[in-house]
Amino acid sequence: MKHILLYILATSTLLSCGSDTKPAEQSTAPAINFKTSSVPVPFAGNWISETYLSDIKEHQSPRKAQENIEECYIQLPDNTLRPSTMVINFHEGISDLVTVNNNGVFQLWEKQGDTLSTLKYTIKPLSRDTIKIDDKLFIKINSSPAGNEPRILEEILFKGAYITKKGEHIEFKSNGEVSGFGKYKYYKPLIDYFDAGLQIDQVGLGETADKMEYFGFKFKRNKLELYKLKCDLYDEVDNRCVEVSYGIKAYDLQKSSGE
């Protein structure tokens, strides 16, 4: 289900993610009332699992990268007491995590009603662009929001200028817009592949942001190849393709030097 992640992220005003899931640690709630002890969070922003980011840089395949992570993304608020969601595998999430400052230590707590119930994660800043959530590293990224859904692959994989074999200039922007690509004005790479019909990396191209035509894609370092989708197995009951592969190559794009 391509829209599971969007549904999860929409349940909270903020988001989250990391590497390997760690069992919840039971602890006594902070003595200070969490409803009144609001302080600035010095490392607010969008944070992505270092494991996921490294895999994307090495293999350039979101589908492959999704196989190696659990906690993967979180958006931390500007101030404590505001909710966040820890995104798990880009498929589900732990919502309503409350950021608190417990005697100088920033933590994420689960709550029941208005009561902090369970210490879920401890956050330790390491540098301006790196934090540790429990024992997992997260890297700060500048992902443009799309409602409550972050544009992650747009920022870390697609963004940049490209040239076609005909010398046409195309630009994929981090906000999900594309220019110079004929009728296509928007693009949306899929980040969640835990469903039928998602056996290959896919990206949507559309004249509008809410109606996309999906293509299979392959990155070969600075080369982006887009393919028509080939349906190998169609489900007559659900009226959808449940197994796909790469079909005819539709576009061959070369990323400009320096991107």
Q: What positions do the PLM features span?
A:
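Positively charged n-region of N-terminal signal peptides that target proteins for export
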Residues: 1-4
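Hydrophobic helical h-region of N-terminal Sec-dependent signal peptides
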Residues: 6-11
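C-terminal motif of bacterial Sec signal peptides marking the signal peptidase cleavage site
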Residues: 15-16
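Short, conserved catalytic or interaction motifs in soluble domains
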Residues: 19
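Beta-sheet ligand-binding and adhesion/scaffold domains
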Residues: 23-37, 53-54, 105-156, 199-259
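Tryptophan-anchored aromatic micro-motifs
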Residues: 29-70, 138, 149-169
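N-terminal glycine/threonine-rich, aromatic-flanked beta-hairpin/loop signature
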Residues: 58-104, 166-212
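A charged, solvent-exposed segment within the mature domains of Sec-exported extracytoplasmic proteins
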Residues: 127-191
